Amino acid sequence: MLPHLPPHIVQSSRLLQCKCGTPLALRFYQHDGDDYRLLTEMYQGFEPKEQSQGLPARLEQQREGWLRYMANKGINLLAIMEGKVVGHAALFEMEHGLRYEYLIFVHQDYQDRGVGTALTEMIKELAQEMGFDQIWLTVAAINRKAIHVYQKVGFCIVGPRDFECVMMLPLKQGDPR
């Protein structure tokens, strides 16, 4: 279970401009309000479905179960542009207090605008502030764009495979890269 987020973090948001100059808001998922509906709408229009380890699920019922799980068990960060959720990043605890898994999806109509980089940088800052040791993820080995973004933020490949790369972001001083 992830640690409880302090209110000053949950209520924080960041206003930026994407590469094309459109305003971009980053904020943490709120359980009260429209966030679940907005997140569901993003994933309904997300293509291709099941592109990353079967996610997001093609079937609506499975996708909604996955979204409810993330909303309740993870730290979720939303990217909002033009009144819509266009990106979603989340952290999940894998080893108590040590390792946290990272996932991110940016809607295909909003890729290559800096949304993924902004989400990843804000998640990294949060993890450092909360004292996490490391964040890890898996990414398709052919997804060069995503690998480039992760490396730019500080992730390194620690376990290449034929179809996937395991990447890790050390957050403590002295962690090997």
Predicted regions and their residues:
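Glycine-rich acyl-CoA binding loop
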Residues: 112-120, 127
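Acetyl-CoA-dependent GNAT
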Residues: 33, 44-103, 107
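Acyl-donor-binding surface of acyltransferase catalytic domains
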Residues: 1-23
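Conserved active-site alpha-helix within GNAT-family acetyltransferase domains
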Residues: 117, 121, 141-159, 163-165
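A short, internal acetyl-CoA/4′-phosphopantetheine-binding micro-motif in the GNAT/acyltransferase core
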Residues: 103-112, 139-140
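Conserved GNAT acetyl-CoA-binding A-motif
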Residues: 127-138
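Short, charged/polar, Gly/Pro-enriched secondary-structure boundary elements
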Residues: 172-177
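A short beta-loop-alpha structural element at the N-terminal edge
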Residues: 22-41
